[in-house]
Amino acid sequence: MASKIETLKANLEAALGARVVSLTEAIGELTLVVKASDYLEVAKMLRDDPKLRFEQLLDLCGVDYQTFGDGAYDGPRFAAVSHLLSVTNNWRLRLRAFAPDDDLPIVASLVDIWTSANWYEREAFDLYGIVFEGHPDLRRILTDYGFIGHPFRKDFPVSGYVEMRYDPEEKRVVYQPVTIEPREITPRVIREDRYGGLKH
């Protein structure tokens, strides 16, 4: 008897055919990668196909692969990643679509298929600059409306470009260029043999 993941994998391959760019398993969950041009059609099939029935979109986020794998990665920079749930079949799926243009990343909006994608797509637009084509209200959701740039992109400086301060003369909050010096953030290395001052 086939396992639940094997059954889901077979159902996905049968339903989607050549639209599957890759289908991999890791940590007990399947990841389906599709082209941006097939993203919307595949999402509809995932929801409507009686052997799949992914009724819920649980999460959607953007990913910037610019420095992925210590720079060894050589593919599209931005992806939209969704996590789907089939309540009917009790299985989950990760759906990934890479935006073909790194300078202006665009993928289709999933709001018409799963309304829960609305604010998730706004967040990915705000933080990564991924444009979700067909979104009914694609505007910033976490940063200021006048914010310049997208703060979760790998090339965005940790200190940002501007800072806010209250100006007592103008009696309002004003923006000014950052006054702190950019610095390299070095990860802390924990030496296990001397951790907490203990010698092993």
Curated annotation (Swiss-Prot):
Tree of life domain: Bacteria
Subcellular location: Cell inner membrane
Sorted UniProt keywords: Cell inner membrane, Cell membrane, Membrane, NAD, Quinone, Translocase, Transport, Ubiquinone
Lipid bilayer topology: Peripheral membrane protein
Main location: membrane
E.C. designation(s): 7.1.1.-
GO MF, one example: NADH:ubiquinone reductase (non-electrogenic) activity
A Pfam cross-reference name: Complex1_30kDa
GO cellular component: plasma membrane
SUPFAM superfamilies found in the cross-reference section: Nqo5-like (SSF143243)
Catalytic activity: a quinone + NADH + 5 H(+)(in) = a quinol + NAD(+) + 4 H(+)(out)
Similarity comment: Belongs to the complex I 30 kDa subunit family.
Record NCBIfam families: NuoC_fam, PRK06074.1-1
Subunit organization: NDH-1 is composed of 14 different subunits. Subunits NuoB, C, D, E, F, and G constitute the peripheral sector of the complex.
Name of the protein this chain belongs to: NADH-quinone oxidoreductase subunit C
